[in-house]
Amino acid sequence: MPVIAGGILAALLLLIVVVLCLYFKIHNALKAAKEPEAVAVKNHNPDKVWWAKNSQAKTIATESCPALQCCEGYRMCASFDSLPPCCCDINEGL
């Protein structure tokens, strides 16, 4: 009987350690994905903090956005008015 209780206790401790390890790995990965909003500076000047905050902003290149096509293929039953043209992605429906 004590052997069974010891085995269950060891399994529970192992499970707790595994869960904590996974929790900290996910926490660190999510923490690393966030960018710092401002740099902490001792005796900071508000202008420097504003510059540090805005210097880390990323610019989005317009070339990275996929070109949208105007789709005329959306039609309804003959008794209804046709839908206005819409912008759809090339890979829509995939």
Swiss-Prot record:
Gene this chain is encoded by: FAM24B
Q: What is this protein called?
A: Protein FAM24B
Signal sequence residues: 1-21
- Protein's UniProt keywords contain Secreted: yes
Entry-linked InterPro entries: FAM24 (IPR028122)
Alphabetically list the UniProt keywords: Secreted, Signal
Organism of this sequence? Homo sapiens (Human)
Question: Per the record's keyword annotation, is Endoplasmic reticulum included, yes or no?
Answer: no
GO cellular component terms, semicolon-separated: extracellular region
Q: What family is this?
A: Belongs to the FAM24 family.
Enumerate the Pfam families for this protein: FAM24
Where it sits in the cell: the answer is: Secreted
